[in-house]
Amino acid sequence: MVIGMDLGVGLPSTIPAATGVDILAWAREADTLGFASLGTLDRIVYSNHETIPTMAAAAAVTSRARLTTAILITPYRGNGALLAKQLATVDSLSGGRLTVGVAVGGRADDYQATGTDFEGRGKVFDAQLAEFDEVWSGEVRGTAGAIGPAPAQAGGPPLLIGGTSKAAVRRTVEHGAGWIAGGGGPETFAQGAERIRRAWSDAGRQGEPRFAALAYYALGPDASVLAESYLHDYYAFLGSYASNVAASALTSRAAINDDIARFADAGCHELLLFPCSPDLTQLQLLADLTCG
């Protein structure tokens, strides 16, 4: 399939039934099948595997696919210097394959569980982004020099900022290599991407911002059941709106092909398709459709 867009697949790390063995098997197989990238979702109060160790483990069992956090919620992780060191470590371990999608997140329970300030998360996020720039540029911090290891990618792994607020647009222009959409389909993505393009140009940034997006998929005779079961549970915090999220899952070959084409037409550079089941059959079905 020639689409002019990188097609990645999410790891099943937020599916409660997925074991560590399942996640690593999925990473190996996706790397072998030719997917451009592997993605992770992020939250605290749920039965998911934590994002940064999962990415490090995926780096160890793959050699080609990029690793994209889609997204990593950084404010409740606190110290920006430590987080910069952790991300630089994953970038080093992966040989420079890390892309860091970051945002403030919208679930208050994650902040309550970590003892961090939900209302003040934007201010913390701004400070962290500035800290990333400083640490990854090699700024001297003490008698031993800079905080290492140096990222494998010069200047640090590319940052894709998530969110649709004015602050998110500002952060993308000030600190990002681009923007990552948090779902909503191709039309919502296109609207957000156009806002970023205008702000990017107005700020005098050179080149083009990188754009990424995500969608959920399930294939096979039980596709709708798999999507409804997982997404209703994962998005239960949204109340009745969880049904809308479940209904948006791509559950047919035609729906997947259509969304891929529409995202590509809207200027998306990387689309991550996240599974609703950790069964490797789901990965093979997607590869049969997209990697041929």
Tell where the protein language model's regions lie, with residue ranges:
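Active-site-adjacent structural elements that line small-molecule/cofactor binding pockets in enzymes
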Residues: M1-G292
